[in-house]
């Protein structure tokens, strides 16, 4: 059985997501959003959405399309099909954990999209800061 190392995002300096997979075990390093100033999808109007945030993030290239880490409810389309045929956490045999190196947005901002069954590890101070940011709606 071979070990696979994959760079999902971050080769241009931000939005780091790297995985190491061996059999049905996967370790992901960081889970951030890339900074892409060259994209021009912002039109000056911000409308807060509570639904489809994962699908929107994948469409915009703000998070990675990876099987087995996202909740089925966030991937299910109106017709019952799965968004881009991404396999949800609930249907996957892959055992995944995410390690966050430090609390910068380009390293951890997308952990909010992960299924609650995916363990996320980070330094205690980073976890405390993340909780404080979530409490003021900035996390």
Where do the model's predicted regions map?
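Short beta-strand scaffold segments in enzyme catalytic cores
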Residues: 14-21
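Di-metal (Zn2+ and/or Mg2+/Mn2+) metal-binding site signature of metallo-dependent hydrolases
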Residues: 91-117, 124
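Transmembrane beta-strand segments of Gram-negative outer membrane beta-barrel proteins
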Residues: 1-3
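Divalent metal-coordination and catalytic microenvironments
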Residues: 5, 20, 30, 102-103
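Residues that form ligand- and interface-recognition hot spots within folded domains
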Residues: 9, 124-126
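Pre-active-site segment of Zn-dependent metallo-hydrolases
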Residues: 25-99, 126-139
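Extended recognition/assembly regions associated with phosphoester-bond processing machinery
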Residues: 6-8, 13
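A short helix->loop->beta-strand "cap" motif at the edges of active sites that frequently abuts
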Residues: 25, 116-119
């Amino acid at each position: 059985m071979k070990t696979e190392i994959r760079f999902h995002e971050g080769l241009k300096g931000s939005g780091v997501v790297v995985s190491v997979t061996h059999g049905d075990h996967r370790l992901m390093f960081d889970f951030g959003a890339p900074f892409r100033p060259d994209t021009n999808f912002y039109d000056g109007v911000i409308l807060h959405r509570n639904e489809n945030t994962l699908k929107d993030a994948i469409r915009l290239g703000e998070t990675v399309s990876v099987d087995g880490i996202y909740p089925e409810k966030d991937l299910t389309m109106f017709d019952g099909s799965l968004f881009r045929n991404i396999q949800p956490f609930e249907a996957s045999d892959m055992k995944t954990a995410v390690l966050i190196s430090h609390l910068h947005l380009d390293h951890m901002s997308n952990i909010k999209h992960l299924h609650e069954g995916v363990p996320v590890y980070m330094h205690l101070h980073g976890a405390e800061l993340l909780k404080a940011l979530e409490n003021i709606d900035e996390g």
